[in-house]
Amino acid sequence: MGSSSFLVLMVSLTLVTLVAVEGVKEDIEKAGVCPADNVRCFKSDPPQCHTDQDCLGERKCCYLHCGFKCVIPVKELEEGGNKDEDVSRPYPEPGWEAKCPGSSSTRCPQK
C-alpha cells in the first residue's frame, strides 16, 4: 500500500504543477502590429523569441528578416484609414519638406 500511495501522491503533484505552469503562461498580445516583411529567405534563422512576453517593453515577437525577433511594432490603422497603405514604411517626421531641397519627396532621403 505504501508504494501505491506514493505513486498517487507523485501523479497528483505533477498534475497540480502542470496546471499551475499553464496558468502562468497566459500569452497577452502587446499593442500594435508586426511590420511588413518582404524579405525572401532560403533558410530561417533560429528564433530569438516565441511570444510577445519574451520581449522587453513594447517590443513584439514578430517574424522579420528570416526569423522571429523582438521588434518595435507599428501602430494599427485607425478606423477609416487607408487599408492599402504600407504601415511599416518609415515616414519622415512632420516638416520634412522644409528640410529637404526641392519639392519632391524622392529627392529627400527618408529616415
From Swiss-Prot:
Compositionally skewed regions (Polar residues) per UniProt: 102-111
Keyword hit for Disulfide bond: yes
Signal peptide: 1-23
GO cellular component, one term: extracellular space
PROSITE patterns per UniProt: WAP (PS51390)
GO molecular function: serine-type endopeptidase inhibitor activity
Chain segments carrying region Disordered: 80-111
Protein name as it appears in the record: WAP four-disulfide core domain protein 12
The organism of origin for this protein: Pan troglodytes
